[in-house]
């Protein structure tokens, strides 16, 4: 048996090919899985459970079917932080805290989306702090659907423009932030996404940091079992 980790699918109505590949993955790759963890940014943008698009509602039905066979866990990302209990319930997903520790076959591991580790991106971290406030989230939820969609589109556009101007270092995790989280959680193994730079990092202090990749051009899946770990790319044509 094995536990699977994915993230950064960025599903949208503009890229239904990714949704189709993910659906095939759910149909074909979970037979021997103990659990599925989705580490954020399942969707490209999420402005509220009351504005879920048809493709997202269909996906919820598929995930609900999966959840009847194995647990499906979800951690919010920077794109879908407004995904709420209503959609999670419809999809059979259990929402986890943004930093969660779990025992993976005897190994204490911390999992998260990963955006909180990119501390050199000061502008984004200010936005992240603001959006985490309960009052800010409540006020946003009170806006009309049209206004929320407009704000989300603006943030998405600004994010793409801003990211093109940021350096590689700023867009990646900051080593001190990684070390601090290891110390805080008393773990030596970490799994996250967000940076879209899949890799297994063996750190000098004996810790291990694994990054799952995005699903823009191919799938990225981390499989963890008692025998070890396997971070693999999954070409979309292999899911047919």
Swiss-Prot record:
<dbReference type="GO" id="GO:0030145">
    <property type="term" value="F:manganese ion binding"/>
</dbReference>
<feature type="binding site">
    <location>
        <position position="41"/>
    </location>
    <ligand>
        <name>Mn(2+) 1</name>
    </ligand>
</feature>
<keyword id="KW-0997">Cell inner membrane</keyword>
<keyword id="KW-0479">Metal-binding</keyword>
<dbReference type="InterPro" id="IPR010138">
    <property type="entry name" value="UDP-diacylglucosamine_Hdrlase"/>
</dbReference>
<keyword id="KW-0472">Membrane</keyword>
<feature type="binding site">
    <location>
        <position position="196"/>
    </location>
    <ligand>
        <name>Mn(2+) 1</name>
    </ligand>
</feature>
<keyword id="KW-1003">Cell membrane</keyword>
<dbReference type="GO" id="GO:0019897">
    <property type="term" value="C:extrinsic component of plasma membrane"/>
</dbReference>
<keyword id="KW-0378">Hydrolase</keyword>
<feature type="binding site">
    <location>
        <begin position="78"/>
        <end position="79"/>
    </location>
    <ligand>
        <name>substrate</name>
    </ligand>
</feature>
<keyword id="KW-0444">Lipid biosynthesis</keyword>
<dbReference type="InterPro" id="IPR029052">
    <property type="entry name" value="Metallo-depent_PP-like"/>
</dbReference>
<dbReference type="GO" id="GO:0005737">
    <property type="term" value="C:cytoplasm"/>
</dbReference>
<feature type="binding site">
    <location>
        <position position="41"/>
    </location>
    <ligand>
        <name>Mn(2+) 2</name>
    </ligand>
</feature>
<protein>
    <recommendedName>
        <fullName>UDP-2,3-diacylglucosamine hydrolase</fullName>
        <ecNumber>3.6.1.54</ecNumber>
    </recommendedName>
</protein>
<dbReference type="GO" id="GO:0009245">
    <property type="term" value="P:lipid A biosynthetic process"/>
</dbReference>
<feature type="binding site">
    <location>
        <position position="121"/>
    </location>
    <ligand>
        <name>substrate</name>
    </ligand>
</feature>
<feature type="binding site">
    <location>
        <position position="113"/>
    </location>
    <ligand>
        <name>Mn(2+) 2</name>
    </ligand>
</feature>
<keyword id="KW-0464">Manganese</keyword>
<feature type="binding site">
    <location>
        <position position="159"/>
    </location>
    <ligand>
        <name>substrate</name>
    </ligand>
</feature>
<dbReference type="GO" id="GO:0008758">
    <property type="term" value="F:UDP-2,3-diacylglucosamine hydrolase activity"/>
</dbReference>
<feature type="binding site">
    <location>
        <position position="194"/>
    </location>
    <ligand>
        <name>substrate</name>
    </ligand>
</feature>
<comment type="similarity">
    <text>Belongs to the LpxH family.</text>
</comment>
<feature type="binding site">
    <location>
        <position position="163"/>
    </location>
    <ligand>
        <name>substrate</name>
    </ligand>
</feature>
<feature type="binding site">
    <location>
        <position position="166"/>
    </location>
    <ligand>
        <name>substrate</name>
    </ligand>
</feature>
<feature type="binding site">
    <location>
        <position position="78"/>
    </location>
    <ligand>
        <name>Mn(2+) 2</name>
    </ligand>
</feature>
<keyword id="KW-0443">Lipid metabolism</keyword>
<feature type="binding site">
    <location>
        <position position="10"/>
    </location>
    <ligand>
        <name>Mn(2+) 1</name>
    </ligand>
</feature>
<comment type="pathway">
    <text>Glycolipid biosynthesis; lipid IV(A) biosynthesis; lipid IV(A) from (3R)-3-hydroxytetradecanoyl-[acyl-carrier-protein] and UDP-N-acetyl-alpha-D-glucosamine: step 4/6.</text>
</comment>
<keyword id="KW-0441">Lipid A biosynthesis</keyword>
<dbReference type="InterPro" id="IPR043461">
    <property type="entry name" value="LpxH-like"/>
</dbReference>
<feature type="binding site">
    <location>
        <position position="194"/>
    </location>
    <ligand>
        <name>Mn(2+) 2</name>
    </ligand>
</feature>
<comment type="function">
    <text>Hydrolyzes the pyrophosphate bond of UDP-2,3-diacylglucosamine to yield 2,3-diacylglucosamine 1-phosphate (lipid X) and UMP by catalyzing the attack of water at the alpha-P atom. Involved in the biosynthesis of lipid A, a phosphorylated glycolipid that anchors the lipopolysaccharide to the outer membrane of the cell.</text>
</comment>
<dbReference type="Pfam" id="PF00149">
    <property type="entry name" value="Metallophos"/>
</dbReference>
<feature type="binding site">
    <location>
        <position position="8"/>
    </location>
    <ligand>
        <name>Mn(2+) 1</name>
    </ligand>
</feature>
<dbReference type="InterPro" id="IPR004843">
    <property type="entry name" value="Calcineurin-like_PHP_ApaH"/>
</dbReference>
